[in-house]
Amino acid sequence: MKSLYYVTQTLLHSRSSNLIKIISLTLGVTVSILIFARQAFELNYDTCYEDYERLYIIKNIYSLNEKITESHNTYGPVAAAIADAFPEEVESVTVTQQWFANTGWYKDDSRFACNAMTGDSCFFSTLGIRLLAGNPNELTNPDVIFISRDMVREVFADQNPIGQTLKMNRELPMTVKGVFEDFPENSSLYGTQIVISLASSFKHDWGYWGWDGGDGYTSFVRLRHAEDAERIIVRSPE
């Protein structure tokens, strides 16, 4: 019992020191958990898409002043050319423009700053993003937009957004034709709330489409099987 008494007294007299040690240990464990969680988050970046092992982004590698440069900017027709060249390996392709950052959109007199991008009818199926409402073929028509679930809550509250009109920069009316699931935080497209039909880009001359210039597009390819990737590596002539 004396031993227990002395141990008890020691703990009582040094309780402040023990408390600091416990707090320090707790903080250390918490920080470790946060670090591990962040590492896991980064290692799982862009794995949020359905069957992400089959999803690829097209990279452009070119030589400029004897320096090799890599870019995800491609010419508009590149994705379709790959699909035509490898019909047995490619399930679908999509082409986007991603430079509509922090664009002003208006519902009546209310302004909403949103990140937007263009997309074609294969946008959602190629990326593996769930479509909550609407027909993706609507993206073949100009002046059409699909909006995220989060934007529906922000702009329309309890109203049905389908058929409603939003104005881009207060000037260009766009009709809401669909709703898609929010891009998660570990996605390169996180924060994108509006997908504008690529047909709108053609109508309003937002970018050149051709093989002799206009590399402001980002292209994605979804393969039928992940192991087909090595067969579709496209190399530019040296």
Predicted regions, residues:
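Membrane-proximal extracellular/periplasmic loop immediately following the first transmembrane helix
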Residues: 35-102, 203, 212-222, 226, ...
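Membrane-interface anchoring determinants
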Residues: 8-10, 44-45, 74, 165
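Short, membrane-interfacial amphipathic segments enriched in basic
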Residues: 1-5
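Short, strongly hydrophobic transmembrane alpha-helices
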Residues: 6, 12-43, 53
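Short acidic/polar micro-motifs at solvent-exposed secondary-structure junctions
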Residues: 60-71, 94-122, 132-145, 169-171, ...
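Structural preference for long, well-ordered alpha-helical segments in enzyme cores
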Residues: 7, 26, 38, 78, ...
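Mid-to-C-terminal secondary-structure elements
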Residues: 119-133, 145-238
